[in-house]
């Protein structure tokens, strides 16, 4: 049977990106990714070519750009999830009273200008998530017992969202870090429980977002993507043939593997579609990366800027940021001399000097969060501003890092189409499930989701009536 090539000759901007990426490659019929109805934008002049024959196609749904077909009405909705994996001093973060008339705590007072733009949560945690310092890997997955033997993670909420809307943007998601231990710690995990490495360099994020690359570099990348697709196709065929000879348990393992293969295949296809589409014009120059890991606050500010630019240019709608204090030395904080590593300070044992230093670190983080809220709010969009269309979740896997407790997690939610200006106080002994927040966030993004991980519903008091 002759192999066929699909010749894309469209001149629309999405079609052009796919055209140039696909012209040199053979589209194999067994590959899931390039299925015409789901994965390609076809020109009305598209032909099937093979063995000297060119056959025109009838008018197909796929001749409408997939990015136009799938585009949700109105302004895009986004999410930014931030985790500081060494927590905050609880008595200085949580308000003493609840409701709309709560009194701002010392830390929340740093955000007083934006009181009506955020909600603070108390008495929340992930059911079954313990594991001490390992618990940060479950911050967005909610997978229980991360410190236990044989633990296997599950999909993080950002990747769950990206699977639904990631095709609408150049990057389905961005996984960022500040001093994150690459390959060991991340907030983002695939549906097969595989860690997605953090990008710690703001300059690298900037390059991905805005620098196009030369024609030769683009061609080289396209060839790599084509080779990757071919490999994925071969792997899929081989695994199908192998299945018939395996036990039930091995078939389950192989199914997990092929799921990862299909996900990689899908990402390859989307990458080809975007490879030649022009990148947006950068609103600012390339950032300069700090040379020392003690510039924790400077790196945090830069990553907040990169997240804002990614949303502002609609390069992605899902961003995670892990601030890894475990991997940070004595960090710089203006006005305070920090004499010990961040992790050691978090185990303060009520030492007055350590508490003073830790308080300065926590307050500086709140100030930076305030800057982020301000900057998002200052970007006007068709329906309000960038903050109104972006849910920002800031929190920690630790309720109290000094005691390694993973209950009573400090969580603040800003922006988006949620009810704000309140303190939602739940039972600090019998905690309310934090996964319910994730369901509410997704529903506020117009995603038809009723369940995620160990959720029991939506979060009480957060969604507008």
Put a short name on every predicted segment.
Residues 2-465:
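Ligand-binding pockets and gating/stacking loops
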